[in-house]
From Swiss-Prot:
Residues 327-413 are annotated as: Interaction with GSK3B. It comes from Homo sapiens (Human). Residues 334-393 are annotated as: Interaction with SIAH1 and SIAH2. Expressed in brain and lymphoblast. The keyword Lipid metabolism does not apply. CDD domains: Axin_TNKS_binding, RGS_Axin. The keyword Ribonucleoprotein does not apply. Probably phosphorylated by GSK3B and dephosphorylated by PP2A. ADP-ribosylated by tankyrase TNKS and TNKS2. Poly-ADP-ribosylated protein is recognized by RNF146, followed by ubiquitination and subsequent activation of the Wnt signaling pathway. This is Axin-2. Keywords: ADP-ribosylation, Cytoplasm, Developmental protein, Phosphoprotein, Ubl conjugation, Wnt signaling pathway. It is linked to Colorectal cancer: A complex disease characterized by malignant lesions arising from the inner wall of the large intestine (the colon) and the rectum. Genetic alterations are often associated with progression from premalignant lesion (adenoma) to invasive adenocarcinoma. Risk factors for cancer of the colon and rectum include colon polyps, long-standing ulcerative colitis, and genetic family history. Oligodontia-colorectal cancer syndrome: Affected individuals manifest severe tooth agenesis and colorectal cancer or precancerous lesions of variable types.
Amino acid sequence: MSSAMLVTCLPDPSSSFREDAPRPPVPGEEGETPPCQPGVGKGQVTKPMPVSSNTRRNEDGLGEPEGRASPDSPLTRWTKSLHSLLGDQDGAYLFRTFLEREKCVDTLDFWFACNGFRQMNLKDTKTLRVAKAIYKRYIENNSIVSKQLKPATKTYIRDGIKKQQIDSIMFDQAQTEIQSVMEENAYQMFLTSDIYLEYVRSGGENTAYMSNGGLGSLKVVCGYLPTLNEEEEWTCADFKCKLSPTVVGLSSKTLRATASVRSTETVDSGYRSFKRSDPVNPYHIGSGYVFAPATSANDSEISSDALTDDSMSMTDSSVDGIPPYRVGSKKQLQREMHRSVKANGQVSLPHFPRTHRLPKEMTPVEPATFAAELISRLEKLKLELESRHSLEERLQQIREDEEREGSELTLNSREGAPTQHPLSLLPSGSYEEDPQTILDDHLSRVLKTPGCQSPGVGRYSPRSRSPDHHHHHHSQYHSLLPPGGKLPPAAASPGACPLLGGKGFVTKQTTKHVHHHYIHHHAVPKTKEEIEAEATQRVHCFCPGGSEYYCYSKCKSHSKAPETMPSEQFGGSRGSTLPKRNGKGTEPGLALPAREGGAPGGAGALQLPREEGDRSQDVWQWMLESERQSKPKPHSAQSTKKAYPLESARSSPGERASRHHLWGGNSGHPRTTPRAHLFTQDPAMPPLTPPNTLAQLEEACRRLAEVSKPPKQRCCVASQQRDRNHSATVQTGATPFSNPSLAPEDHKEPKKLAGVHALQASELVVTYFFCGEEIPYRRMLKAQSLTLGHFKEQLSKKGNYRYYFKKASDEFACGAVFEEIWEDETVLPMYEGRILGKVERID
């Protein structure tokens, strides 16, 4: 930058006076320099006179003659050399501020330290300490000064300090090297820096930037005015940017030099501050960032082919971006415009703020209306929370009841305390409306009087609600008591029957507990071992009574053919009982042993009621039964129904006599009176062919045994049980009053378990649901285990599926979990002796 660029000719004498501006002519010498001489061109008139650095001065320092330019300004001297810049206090401070921003201020500090050391007295003791401090601070610690010095220079300084040969010029070589580096790099960058250009724009005389720390508080302000809130009023006092007397031209070089500061500037106490590294104020979210080219808006009109006659200025063509001396074609103007854009580039400006407005649906509402709507919503939320909390508390209570019941059952099983089924103690009114109970009551009455017709509808109708009917049931309940009218100690003690209330009846809480237990714990079919274990626990809770004491069973029957297994005395016999099969309805060990001494009139068999299962289990059994009936039955299953009559024909006379005595009792003649059908309750309906009672009971036992076992296991198990019953009858043929069920349980259990295990080892039951179908598929495979690959081969439909198999698990309260298996070599898990799986399609 030369001094000629800063000296301008003032066309108007009334313009503002500058120190470096030319002075008016001295009176009397106005004609010395005519404004226009003949023969001089137009360009020479407007050419400013160069101001040399060697202005005419008096040798005696008395000042300059009048009519000549003033001496060089500080800004002009700064551009001459680095010495001139550092020789001025403001220049040195401004240059130091620039180096601090560039993080190389140590070079300037080292240069001033060398100047100060050169002026120190060598005889002073502080000189050695200062030399060592300069060496350690700037040269020894591998700083930026040490990197710019030559190795020989650093070695010379180090040797001089070690030998304590201190000289005033020992740092001159290092200072010269640092000065040359600053002149080549930092000084040239400083002359084009934004901090220097702003100081030039302010004229160097503005005291606003010299206060509060001098030039360090210099701020460059450009762009839009600060964002103003709608409720505030803008005042000029908050705006610190003041117009400067001189303006630097907006050339591409100047714009590039000041782009970084203008893009990172901030306005104090303003709402809109723009900084690329800082997050945007939430008030202006969504407005984006604005990048405007450093050209006029008219250039954009030209670039958009909007050059028309009405868009051209008739007075001054410079407004339209067209030089006054050159009016070319449209393509030439576009090319010049594109070159101007490339030269200037894009100047980043702060993003233009947008007013943050409320959504349309947020309209003002009356306070009363708003309060009513808010209260209604809060009440609805409160009800939802309360219902959720009550449901959680209820589930927690049910869970605690289950845990408490499980602990009680475990304690009872350990102590061997006798328990009685709670459903047998319910009064008649609790199950009066249950159709299953009505059929069971009717069947028990029919079997009580096997030689008579079915009772009439008018007298013994279980649907009747008359007081006589209630009294009849109540008397039936009291008939469970022994002749003394009291329960025996084994049944009357609270420890024996903990579910009884204070008066011998089941309370409401107990009934709820019983229902919850048998619905949630016995919905899944039990295995044979579980049924036998529960039977051995309940068999202790019996009441050994006389001839008038009996208990009847409410057995869970099939949905189409209810079966019962009563153990009542027929024909007035006191010592005879019916030979029973061990099945799901008639559990082993329920028959009572004979009285001590083996008297003929000793034992009355006690039949305990089995629990009421879930209705869904009945539907499941009905589906299995329907599937069984639709398939052709094997020969073994067909021959089972006729097994007992054939065996009766082949049995010995003593065996037939024993069987006849068991059924005939003391009546002296076999049963000849036909019994009506179970469902024949209408007198007008013709009676069916009366079946043999013994064969019917055998069929009931067979069906009960089939319910708890797979289809192909029923035949073998039923035949084994029939063989055991007949063998027991043959062994006790000499004593016709003995009970076949009196055979030791230790001899029957190993045989039965061995048969079951042998059957399970030979055949494997596989049941699976396919792709969400409601009816499952069931297959029997002759294998001990099954892998996923073999299971896939059994599927008729091939495709991509997911395979889940049920297995026992303690992770959840249900005790089971479906596990996904994807490897063909994995052995499928078993649940309750069978494989239960689900096949789901991969979407």
